[in-house]
Regions:
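Catalytic phosphate/metal-binding cores of nucleic-acid and nucleotide-processing enzymes, i.e., regions
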Residues: 1-107
Length: 107
């Protein structure tokens, strides 16, 4: 079962990277070797937008240390999302694209 969850999470991660790159962003993998609980990815979008993403297999929840780190990052004013479905990725990208239209006056 654990192997299937890892495969699902990897599939979601690949989709995230593809979609962020499609809109001109960069999706960096954060090594947690010395920083337990850090989100899996930091997404850098054109226009200076930054998003931290915790990737999970469908239905899985973040561990307590991850939730603690999410709170710390949010307290600094950054956005943190927990993603376990492709639909959530679509929603994040759509929100980013809408913000870009609004800020550039293209609406």
């Amino acid at each position: 079962m654990e192997s299937k969850n890892i495969t699902c999470e990897n599939s979601i991660e690949k989709r995230l990277v593809t979609e962020v790159e499609r809109v001109g962003g960069w999706c960096l993998k954060l090594p947690a070797i010395h920083n337990a609980g850090l989100p899996d990815r930091i997404c850098l979008f054109p226009g200076g937008r930054i998003l931290f993403v915790e990737l999970k297999a469908p239905g899985k929840k973040p561990r307590e240390i991850q939730l603690f780190m999410h709170r710390k990052i949010r307290a600094l004013g950054f956005r943190v999302e927990v993603v376990d479905t492709p639909e959530q990725i679509k929603k994040i990208i759509k929100e980013y694209e809408e913000q870009c239209k609004f800020s550039s006056g293209k609406n």
